[in-house]
A protein has these predicted regions:
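Lipid interaction determinants
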Residues: 1-131
Length: 131
């Protein structure tokens, strides 16, 4: 049997109240484990940790199921080590380029468009919510 989320229409409602952790960049390229990059959908907004800084943005549904735009993105402005700053910058750029969302083997898939027109996909695992 398919999970309930997989059988519902792809609207932002299926993401409401959910929290996710980035587990793969394009083509399964692993992400940094510590600190985790997170994504939460709450109260009509998205936000989380980009690795060093907190971020927030507005999700905008498209005209067709599964279409999604995120942005503009605002962040806190903490000084970050170079390694974190690079992955954080990459994540925030890709997040603002998101065009579609869906689910792949229980993971949230956010597809975005690179500057050269190629399509990439970030994969997220759902975070357990405390009781």
């Amino acid at each position: 049997a398919l999970p309930e989320r997989a059988t519902r229409r792809l609207t932002l409602d299926v993401l409401a109240g959910s929290e996710w952790t980035l587990v793969a960049w394009d083509a399964g390229e692993p992400t940094p484990d510590d600190p985790a990059i997170t994504l939460a959908f709450r109260d009509g907004r998205v936000g989380g940790s980009a690795g060093c800084n907190r971020y927030f943005a507005s999700p905008q549904p498209g005209p067709s199921p599964g279409e999604l735009a995120i942005g503009p993105v605002g962040t806190t402005r903490m000084a970050c080590p170079d390694a974190l700053a690079g992955s954080e910058s990459r994540y925030l750029q890709q997040l603002q380029a998101v065009r579609r969302f869906g689910f792949l083997l229980g993971r949230l898939a956010l597809s975005y468009q690179h500057g050269d027109g190629a399509i990439g996909t970030m994969l997220f695992e759902e975070r357990a919510t405390p009781p």
